[in-house]
């Protein structure tokens, strides 16, 4: 394993860790898979499905040979993350109009979001280097995940959250896990800039998506999907686009699976952004070479409220390698899609629902054929943003087409009989 700059190609050892190359580029992790046999790996991964109390009970560390083979087992900080549900539901299928749709509920992770898949690897790597203080800037899910893993690993976490346009549910979860939480003026992007400048001097290990070990852990999402589907993936993988680490990780994981011969074709990736925070989609749609940051992004889907996604270059490479596409969706499209996902019994936070909303739009626009198959990644739990539930079902929003209201009634048989 080595770290290679995506800009200039310089490589460094993983135990001489840095987030940025001297040229300013981000590092990517390059693994050597030449000695792996696909059938032996399948057998090993299937055997580990029966693990219960070891690190390999984790839906991330089950694939340790493809994620961080050099890491000593005693350095693994895990809460048996992963192992999340893969579902189909007729309501979602009818809403989108596609032949076959899966949803991967990363919302079932221990802290309630997909961030756990990457955070277990980042914190474990930091521990192996001797770090005791971990940090991130976050609109919510990264912070609660980091706070949880830091506490499990008997370390401290220092979290920077914007002072507006965030979900207080996520902040309260982070506080409850014992993190030192700082409410800052400005945006997620301002927090990233601060940590890039000062984290090393402060002795802090950064766990944002600029950390390539986060990406390695998040690859496990697509590994797990492939294993559950007997190594036969759908035509499309649909993912929400905020910081773009998840899209990057899924693309990298697909490349690994294809290179190893574990799958025989690459699915196409669709990255969905919210209209109010869609600089990556705008770049792709307008065929621009560089991303133009949005200095004042806003979307009700707070996890997508990022105007300068740090992983955009890696995500652009993912689109190129998978012949992928992008789309943007309005907040009301997101919230209506969320209502369908919730009503199916699966549930998710608003940002997750961007995948279903985006897939519906792409099918309606005939960019995805109705005869194809797709899988939507649901990134966060339904309880991550209860304010969104209140606004949708209790507010005066006339375009909330799946509103379900609380009904006040007297407790007598005939009245209840009329409702039923």
Roles of regions detected by a PLM:
Residues 1-420:
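PLP-dependent amino-acid enzyme catalytic core
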């Amino acid at each position: 394993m080595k770290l290679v700059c995506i800009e200039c190609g310089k490589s460094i050892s993983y135990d001489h860790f840095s987030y940025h190359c001297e040229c300013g580029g981000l590092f990517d992790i390059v693994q050597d898979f030449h000695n792996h046999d696909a059938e032996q790996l399948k057998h090993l991964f299937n055997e580990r499905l029966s693990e219960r109390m070891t690190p390999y009970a984790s839906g991330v560390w089950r694939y340790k040979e493809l994620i961080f083979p050099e890491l000593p087992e005693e350095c693994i900080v895990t809460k048996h993350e992963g192992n999340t549900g893969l579902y189909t539901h007729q309501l979602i299928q009818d809403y989108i109009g596609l032949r076959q749709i899966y949803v991967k509920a990363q919302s079932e992770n221990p802290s309630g979001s997909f961030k756990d898949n990457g955070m277990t690897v980042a914190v474990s790597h930091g521990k192996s280097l001797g770090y005791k203080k971990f940090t991130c800037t976050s609109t919510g899910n990264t912070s609660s995940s980091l706070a949880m893993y830091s506490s499990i690993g008997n370390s401290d976490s220092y979290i920077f959250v914007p002072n507006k346009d965030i979900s207080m549910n996520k902040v309260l979860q982070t506080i409850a896990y014992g993190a030192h939480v700082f409410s800052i003026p400005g945006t997620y992007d301002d927090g990233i800039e601060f940590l890039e400048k000062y984290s090393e001097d402060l002795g802090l290990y950064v766990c944002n998506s600029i950390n390539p070990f986060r990406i390695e852990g998040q690859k496990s999402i697509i590994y797990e999907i492939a294993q559950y589907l007997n190594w036969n993936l759908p035509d499309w993988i649909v993912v929400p686009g905020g910081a773009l680490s998840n899209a990057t990780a899924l693309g990298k994981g697909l490349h690994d699976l294809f290179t190893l011969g574990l799958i025989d074709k690459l699915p196409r990736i669709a990255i969905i952004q919210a209209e109010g925070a869609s600089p990556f989609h705008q770049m792709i749609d307008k065929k621009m070479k560089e991303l133009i940051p949005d200095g004042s992004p806003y979307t009700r889907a707070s996890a997508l409220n990022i105007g300068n996604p740090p992983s955009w270059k890696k995500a652009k490479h993912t689109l190129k390698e998978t012949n992928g596409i992008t789309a943007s969706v309005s907040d009301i499209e997101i919230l209506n899609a969320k209502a369908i996902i919730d009503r199916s019994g699966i549930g998710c936070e608003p940002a997750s629902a961007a995948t279903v909303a985006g897939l519906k739009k792409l099918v309606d626009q005939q960019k995805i054929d109705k005869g194809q198959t797709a899988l939507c990644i649901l990134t966060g739990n339904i309880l991550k943003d209860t304010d969104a539930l209140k606004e949708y079902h209790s507010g005066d929003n006339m375009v909330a087409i799946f509103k379900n209201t609380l009904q006040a009634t007297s407790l007598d048989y005939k009245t209840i009989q009329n409702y039923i």
